[in-house]
Amino acid sequence: MKLQKLPVRLAVAATVGFLSIATNGPVHCPVRGAEPEAKPVPFEAGFGERDITPPAGLPMWGYGARHDMLSQGALDPLFAKAVVIHAGDDKLAIVGLDMGRGPTQPMMEKIRRALSEKAKIAHVMISGSHTHHGPVLELTDRKGFGKGKFDKAIAYTNRLPDLIVEAILDADRNAKPARVGINSRVDLNLNRNRQSKRPIKATDPMLAMMRFDDASTGKPIAVVVNFAAHPVMTNERILKYSADYPGFMKKHVESQLDTHCVFMQGASGDMSVNAGQYNGPQKFGEHLGDLVIELAKAAKTQVPPHPAIKGRVDHFLFHSRTDFSNPLVTALYSRAFFPELVRNFVAEFQDGVPVELNTILLNGDTALVGGSGEFFSNHSNRLKERAYVPHALFFGYCNGHSMYFPTIEAASEGGYGADAQVSPAEVGAGEQVMNRALVNLYTMLGKLRPSDDAPAAEHPRTASTSRP
């Protein structure tokens, strides 16, 4: 982003005895106390969406140079698109937003509470696409923090969590027996490293697709796309809302496959689009969509042999490299952005940099990891290399926004996204988050004991919630 950033080993086996006595034939003797054969766990999936396009007249998110300039309408609509997965009684919601960031912490609290009370959905991953043509979400109903001057924006952000919940509840109600298939490519050159000064620059080339089909008809229910690159192809001087290239990709996939498409942004902290001949958000989005369609058509879906959802949420509070209590610092930020936005930002970061990590193990073979910020691509690459599962996807801007997380070597290089101004968390914070995700996954896989997965003693401000 451009400156706006300121602003579950014990395996329990029921053994059924079979005793063959050499008389007139076999005699079947069930072992006393044996449990009955377990019923298959149902696997279901459903889709839901809501139009979340704001009204005109809200300050726009993404470029500090806009300051508090107000939007003048929309180039294309913004959506919240959700897939809800059932594995027996356990439920996971995967939500893609055409927003610059994930929901704020108060929004997430409201969303989680509603989903728990109304649908018993315990696992939630909501990622912003990181479009730089969405509304500012951080303003609050306090004098000097948005009240009075930006009441229209506050009214919208008060309504947004309800719209997201509605989309998720629709997906939950629409859930039906499903098959799932995952396909990906890593031989593409669709993104480029915009930060590194090294001759060989890191990228996360993976384009991944999860396809959910109706188990009885084979008709696609939805596809979930995971790709990493900043959606900044729309001219920053255009003060209108736009989903940028992810919006055109989704629309193209939906029209060609007659299904629904959810976009989940990856670790794009240092990733920009490598457009080549596909200049502009529509051309690039449709080209990306063509590649997604190829992956979807080639994917083989099946009912998972052992449907299961295991999840854990970790919260970190990292030391800040920037002193937000210094009035000179806040004054400089206010000049770069606008005062009301900066006051909300400082209030959130005054005790340190808060980070949320979501780790999901789906069906025992798919890792879904979500981090609340702009993680550099090598964080995702290294997680995928070290997680010995068939499929591993990383979702950025997930369930919040904690600014940039450069790798240690990137922080040593400096530059935008790596310097303290927009990546205030202590150096190495990203690595700590990814290590935590890896321990979570191996614990869920039964390869580490739960007693081994307590947060490290040197990070006493790390808290976690497990939802096996």
Regions of interest found by a model, annotated:
Residues 8-10, 32, 134-136:
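Alpha-helical and His/Cys-centered functional microenvironments
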Residues 18-39, 466-468:
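Bacterial Sec-dependent signal peptides at the C-terminal "C-region" and cleavage site
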Residues 289:
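Charged, flexible cofactor/metal-binding loops and thiol motifs
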Residues 1-27:
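Bacterial N-terminal signal peptides that target proteins for export
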Residues 35-260, 264-271, 277-286, 296, ...:
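Conserved beta-alpha junction segments in alpha/beta enzyme cores
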